[in-house]
Structures are given as structure tokens and as C-alpha cells.
């Protein structure tokens, strides 16, 4: 059976993508990275629940401490408040973590190569293109080239991003067809128990459910 590393944060996009990868016939090697984010505890809890439902071959948890030392993002620097979200925002959000996905993809590549895997899945989507340069098609193309050049595998590892040109509503629609357990997922940038409902990630998630005439199954602050 072919194997793939799925970067699994426990959020909507990465969870749906892991189910897509399984549907494509891959055995799933789930990679969850704690990088000092505010919602580290809840994201890990969500990722483990999703991994159990998926029946992954392996669940690997990696912890990084250097992003907190770098700061510069409201997700990792507790002195910077997570700003209220605005749908369709065009400028740089303070929730951007400098080159985070470059780091995560590099770790996933090492993991994939060590397990003789064939692919890496990361859930970047169109709503992240503005303000998050490490979520763009151009960035993914560059990282794919680096993987080709920098690995020894006889069969090239593919960096797969099926959602890169899809919005969150379309992702949710696909996930519902795959019976993704969204009640186990977590998207909020700031809270670990009840989602705030006002950060950009919460707003995008709520909009997706509203677009499909559905109620989000996770708890929100009143």
C-alpha cells in the first residue's frame, strides 16, 4: 500500500484533506506539529481524535520551541493580541507565522523519506493566498522543486495540495460527502475551550457552514 504523510493540525482543511488522501488509497502517516501556538493543547487533542477516526498507520507528534522565541506573530507571541478577523482582508494579518509552512513541509519531507512514503499532503487553500505567502501555489511549486533536489528516494516524493485553488465552503462540501467528523476539529486561533467566533479562522469556518445552510458542531463563546 502506498503511504503519504498528512500534515494534520486538527483544523477543517487538514482534516478534510487527510480523508481525501485516504480515499485516494494512501495509508496515512499523520504528522502533527506543536510550534508554541496559543491553541496547541486543543489542536493536538483534535488531531488525535481525527487520527483515531481515520485509522492512521502512525501518528507522529513533533514539538518546536523556536517559533515562540522568534515571536512576530500573535499565534506564538502572547504579547500580541490576536486581531479580529475581516473576511476578504487584503493586507498582512498578524496571525502569519514567518515561514511556518516551509518548516512544516521540510519536517514532513524528512518523515516521508524515512518511511519510504510517496506523497505529502498539506491543506493550503485559496483563502490563505493573501497575507500568507507560504500558502500560495508559487510557494508550493518552489518547495516541490526543493524536495525533488534534496531527497534520495528513487521515486520522487510528491507535494500534493488538492485544495490550493478551493475555498473553505467547497472544502466543507467535499468533507461532508466523505463524512468528515467536524465536531472533532478545531480552527480558532485564540481559544482552547470555546471558539472565539471573531478571529479570521473562526469567521471563515462559520461562513463555510452558513453557506451550506449548516450549523457548526463545535462550541462558540456566546
UniProtKB/Swiss-Prot annotation:
Cofactor, how bound (note): Binds 1 zinc ion per subunit.
Keyword Ligase: yes
Pathway membership, UniProt: Purine metabolism; 7-cyano-7-deazaguanine biosynthesis
InterPro entries: QueC, Rossmann-like_a/b/a_fold
A Pfam entry, by short name: QueC
Broad class of enzyme this protein falls into: ligase
Domain of life according to the entry: Archaea
Cofactor(s) listed in the protein's UniProt record: Zn(2+)
Keywords for the protein's UniProt record, in alphabetical order: ATP-binding, Ligase, Metal-binding, Nucleotide-binding, Zinc
EC numbers, comma separated: 6.3.4.20
Sample GO molecular function, one term: ATP binding
Cited PANTHER family: 7-CYANO-7-DEAZAGUANINE SYNTHASE (PTHR42914:SF1)
Family: Belongs to the QueC family.
Protein name (Swiss-Prot/TrEMBL): 7-cyano-7-deazaguanine synthase
Organism: Methanocorpusculum labreanum (strain ATCC 43576 / DSM 4855 / Z)
Gene field: queC
Amino acid at each position: 500500500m502506498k503511504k503519504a504523510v498528512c500534515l494534520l493540525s486538527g483544523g477543517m482543511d487538514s482534516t478534510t484533506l487527510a480523508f481525501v488522501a485516504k480515499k485516494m488509497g494512501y495509508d496515512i502517516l499523520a504528522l502533527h506539529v506543536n510550534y508554541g501556538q496559543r491553541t496547541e493543547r486543543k489542536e493536538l487533542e483534535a488531531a488525535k481524535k481525527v487520527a483515531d477516526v481515520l485509522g492512521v498507520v502512525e501518528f507522529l507528534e513533533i514539538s518546536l520551541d523556536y517559533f515562540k522565541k522568534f515571536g512576530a506573530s500573535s499565534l506564538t507571541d502572547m504579547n500580541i493580541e490576536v486581531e479580529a478577523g475581516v473576511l476578504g482582508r487584503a493586507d498582512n494579518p498578524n496571525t502569519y507565522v514567518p515561514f511556518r509552512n516551509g518548516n512544516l513541509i521540510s519536517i514532513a519531507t524528512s518523515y516521508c523519506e524515512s518511511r519510504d512514503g510517496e506523497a505529502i499532503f498539506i491543506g493550503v487553500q485559496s483563502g490563505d493566498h493573501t497575507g500568507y505567502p507560504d500558502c500560495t501555489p508559487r510557494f508550493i511549486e518552489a518547495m516541490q522543486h526543493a524536495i525533488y533536489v534534496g531527497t534520495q528516494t528513487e521515486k520522487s516524493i510528491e507535494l500534493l495540495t488538492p485544495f490550493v485553488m478551493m475555498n473553505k465552503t467547497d472544502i466543507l462540501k467535499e468533507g461532508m460527502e466523505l463524512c468528515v467528523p467536524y465536531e472533532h476539529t478545531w480552527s480558532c486561533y485564540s481559544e482552547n475551550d470555546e471558539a472565539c467566533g471573531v478571529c479570521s479562522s473562526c469567521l471563515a469556518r462559520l461562513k463555510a457552514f452558513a453557506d451550506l445552510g449548516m450549523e457548526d458542531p463545535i462550541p462558540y463563546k456566546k
